Amino acid sequence: MSRIFISYRRDDSAGFAGRLADGLEAALGAGGVFRDVDDIRPGEDFQAAIRHHLENVDAVLVMIGPRWLAAGAAGGRRLDDAGDFVRMEIATALASGKPVIPVLVGGATMPAEADLPAPLAGLARRQAVVLSDDSWSADLARLAAALGARASARSAATLGVRRWLPLPGQPPGAPGRRSS
């Protein structure tokens, strides 16, 4: 199962999302990144697939480009539409308590809380990462290191770290019994 979920708008940051996915796969290992166009099979219910992957990842990266808040074909902002997939992805991730990391690309700036619909307001309080063309490799390396450290910490917590407790009457560090 993928460890990282990339949420993006195709008409805003698809190229950046693909480049990021490739870089993270190289850094974190094959199969570590979920991106819809790469990981949803033809004929599969994409809404169910997205929800399934969101439930099983360690972190969600929200790609924010210059047109991320722009209006859709109907004229209103897409994020204001409850059926917008980007909105659904972010709201689901925020509600689950998963780490949600805004990734600013193409010179985009972080949206203010007032610019976001209520279910997404928490996104504005997340520390963002900037990926720029001028320093892509260094920016990607920092992000990959942070994601790798986060996943390692989660794995250790999930597996449970066992300590050895000394038997009664034994000094600390002496052979003892396991504690969970």
Residues covered by each model-derived region:
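Short acidic-hydrophobic, aromatic-tinged amphipathic segments that line or gate anion-handling sites
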Residues: A128-S132
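Juxtacatalytic C-terminal regulatory tail of Ser/Thr protein kinases
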Residues: R150-R163
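Conserved N-terminal substructure of TIR/SEFIR domains
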Residues: M1-R67, A73-G76, A82, V86, ...
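Short, charged/polar surface micro-motifs in flexible loops or helix N-caps
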Residues: P66-A70, G107-M110
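Glycine-rich, charge-decorated loop segments at or immediately adjacent to ligand/cofactor-binding or catalytic sites
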Residues: A108-A121
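Conserved beta-strand/loop subsegment of P-loop NTPase cores
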Residues: V100-V103
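C-terminal or otherwise distal, non-catalytic regulatory regions appended to signaling enzyme catalytic cores
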Residues: V161-S180
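A short helix-turn-beta junction within AAA+ P-loop NTPase domains corresponding to the substrate/partner-engaging
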Residues: A124-R125
